[in-house]
């Protein structure tokens, strides 16, 4: 069974590029791609490129979809009226977030079935931004979670969650790249569930975990030192 879904992404976001790469490998082909071209997108793209510095970066969107008849639309803001009208006209069953700003209710109301996100951290324990860095600083396990989107920040029902095995050879940058891949794989699993019927739903306990902003530089450096010095508690080797 095919799934009619729209793929939303900030322009050339490396997280979204990896997700689209894996979706296409699994024959999960979006009906359309809507990329946001904005200063916010530029900042977020550079932020993730820094987090993945020295790691292999997926091809650009144009290369990934070369030879495929996937329409690509550009908007100034995924939350604006133009984007909403575009999505309403397409009537997707599902919106897939492949690295976006926080999406507002006016957009979340458009898909007939759901909006799905893949969070680069283990929910419900670490919501919000920079989960890899926070997990290192707080000495917590690394992983990813695919979940339905609700009006909160990373609070929607969980579809699938998986820990990432951390090796002593890992770096902060390699963990970010590996978690981008894991997140993308979980998104592919989630869309396969939806294409075949319904996906699992595990409600989150809102009293568990915390919602965090971008990690301050000094705390991030402490997390990196913990990993580099072998003081991280969750190695698999």
Language-model segments: residues:
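One-carbon transfer enzymes
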Residues: 1-237
């Amino acid at each position: 069974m095919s799934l009619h879904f729209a793929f939303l992404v900030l322009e050339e976001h490396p997280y979204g590029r990896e997700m689209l790469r894996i979706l296409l490998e699994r024959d999960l082909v979006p009906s359309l791609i809507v990329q946001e071209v904005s200063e916010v997108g530029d900042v977020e793209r550079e932020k993730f490129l820094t987090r993945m510095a020295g790691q292999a970066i997926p091809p650009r969107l144009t290369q990934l979809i070369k030879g495929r008849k996937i329409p690509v639309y550009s908007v100034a803001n995924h939350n604006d009226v133009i984007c909403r009208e575009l999505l309403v006209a397409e009537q997707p069953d599902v919106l897939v977030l492949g690295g976006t700003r926080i999406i507002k209710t006016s957009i979340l109301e458009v898909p007939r079935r759901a909006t799905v996100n893949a969070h680069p951290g283990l929910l419900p324990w670490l919501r919000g931004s920079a989960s890899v860095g926070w997990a290192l600083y707080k000495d917590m396990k690394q992983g990813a979670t695919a979940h339905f989107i609700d009006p909160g920040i990373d609070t929607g029902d969980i579809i699938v969650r998986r820990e990432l095995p951390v090796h002593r050879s890992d770096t902060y940058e390699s963990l970010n790249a590996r978690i981008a891949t894991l997140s993308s794989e979980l998104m592919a699993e989630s869309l396969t569930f939806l294409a075949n019927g319904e996906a699992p739903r595990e409600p989150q306990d809102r009293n568990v975990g915390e919602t965090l902003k971008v990690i301050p530089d000094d705390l991030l450096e402490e997390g990196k030192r913990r990993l580099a010095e072998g003081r991280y508690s969750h190695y698999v080797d």
